[in-house]
Amino acid sequence: MLEIARTAFLREGYAAASMSEIAAKVGGSKATLYSYFPSKKDLFAAVIEEEVQQMLAPLFEMDETQGDVRTVLERFARRFLDLLLTEDTVAFYRLIVAESARFPEIGQAAYQIGVQHGLDHLAGYFLAAMERGELRRADASVAVAQFLDLCSGELHRKRLFGVVGADDRDEVEKQVRNAVATFLAAYGAVQARAARLRSSAP
């Protein structure tokens, strides 16, 4: 059911997708579809949640205990970009952005289900790294948002405009190295030690 709805939303857009047509392709009645999903918004939210879970699964399966903070962040950034640049992710991103102007609840749902979930997961790692002295103590939620923006950056914009493809490894590796280096220049262990020295100074 969700796969059929997913195809309809990507092909027709949220506004034009018909619950009746989706029900017909599923093989049941419209009433049956509404018994599972009371509204088209609920169905779309379920599709987004399913899509996000599949997209983010490789990130949440990462073993964050293996390697120093630079290694872990580079591994995360690489997987994050690999997911962000896929055809499916780009298609859903464009769909959500296009529909959010008319249906702001769609954008809000996508943010809570996808973006916020990812932010919360990574914030847990950042907090632990701050406790270990590997990162400078700071607001973890702000640090995560800044790190993810550094990861996506210009490469994501190029992908959305069709300048690069999903499998441009040289561009991905360049973005990963630059993002992690810039982030650690602000939040890394040297900055953490300097902050501790300042706080202990008479």
Predicted regions and their residues:
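Short secondary-structure transition hinges
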Residues: 56, 82-127, 169
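Short hydrophobic clusters on alpha-helical segments that form packing/core surfaces
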Residues: 1-9, 80, 183
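C-terminal peripheral helix-coil segments that are non-catalytic and often amphipathic
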Residues: 71, 75, 79-81, 120, ...
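Helix-turn-helix
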Residues: 4-42, 46-47
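Membrane-interface starts of transmembrane alpha-helices
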Residues: 136, 140-144
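Amphipathic alpha-helical linker/stalk segments
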Residues: 47-76, 84, 88, 122, ...
